[in-house]
């Protein structure tokens, strides 16, 4: 909705009271999920640094984002859109994230810059990340709503940001802004990825600390704690109902072995005969 604030006049009073627009938190609900993302298996999809830290306030690169979503595709989608080639001048077959970039480009999820580059080591902004995340959902272009005070009607990213808001992937800040050109943090990115996967972690329903991978810069008092634990710990779960929602939140039931994504991608790569081609039988 476009209003940033409202003024209400209490009964029997001549004074007006200002009410800022509330900032709502969304989750993707039933029926609004993605058909090409693996929403069933709760695999971890990021790892920490060699020094043992997760750096939730650190930035994330375009190549890393492509790799995360590539790993989280359904097997059917990955098979259908598999590619090892692309038209970017800075993404050749030797690039560590080439398969991810090529496949997601083939899906139409990501694209590059007007100079023909993709810039895999470049940082990614909040608007760019929103565009990628909402690309996995079927959405329709709607009239400009003005959800955020710093998103103009004619900006290149407006339709993507507003669509991502409508399907419940993103939210803005308490001051009514979205800050589209600010680089997204690792914590913010994981929150959006979890929403895209319809994952609903809650701190009180995780496993005991001793049974999880933990991080010195990610503690239960941090706002991003549950989402970062979700992103870094593979686990089994069951759904908990609340308020008529059968899938209101997830309760972890067991820690699973971490998936070896490098080995997984190698096996998938060798199983294909050609970029975008058939699986070798």
Language-model features and meaning:
Residues 131, 163, 191, 217-218:
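Predominantly extracellular/luminal carbohydrate-interaction, adhesion, and secreted-enzyme modules
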Residues 187-194:
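Alpha-helical segment that forms one wall of the substrate-binding/catalytic cleft
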């Amino acid at each position: 909705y476009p209003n940033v604030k409202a003024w209400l006049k209490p009964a029997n009073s001549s004074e007006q009271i200002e009410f800022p627009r509330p900032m709502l938190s969304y989750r993707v609900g039933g029926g609004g999920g993605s058909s090409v993302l693996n929403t069933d298996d709760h695999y971890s999809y990021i790892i920490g640094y060699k020094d043992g830290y997760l750096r939730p306030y650190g930035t994330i690169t375009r190549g890393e984002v492509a790799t995360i979503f590539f790993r989280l595709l359904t097997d059917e989608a990955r098979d259908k859109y598999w590619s090892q080639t692309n038209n970017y001048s800075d993404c050749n077959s030797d690039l560590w994230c080439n398969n991810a970039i090529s496949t997601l480009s083939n899906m139409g999820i990501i694209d590059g810059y007007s100079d023909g580059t993709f810039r895999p080591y470049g940082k990614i902004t909040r608007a760019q990340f929103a565009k990628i995340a909402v690309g996995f959902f079927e959405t329709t272009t709607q009239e400009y709503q003005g959800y955020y005070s710093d998103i103009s009607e004619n900006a290149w990213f407006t339709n993507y940001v507003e669509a991502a808001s409508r399907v419940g992937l993103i939210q803005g800040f308490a001051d009514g802004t979205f800050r589209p050109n600010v680089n997204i943090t690792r914590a913010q990115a994981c929150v959006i990825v979890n929403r895209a996967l319809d994952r609903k972690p809650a701190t009180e329903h995780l496993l005991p600390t001793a049974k999880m991978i933990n991080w010195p810069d990610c503690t239960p008092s941090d706002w991003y704690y549950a989402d970062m634990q979700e992103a870094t710990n593979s686990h089994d779960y069951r759904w908990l109902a609340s308020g008529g929602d059968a899938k209101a939140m997830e309760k972890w039931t067991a820690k699973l072995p971490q998936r070896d994504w490098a080995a997984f991608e190698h096996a998938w790569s060798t199983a294909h005969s050609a970029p975008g081609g058939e699986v070798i039988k």
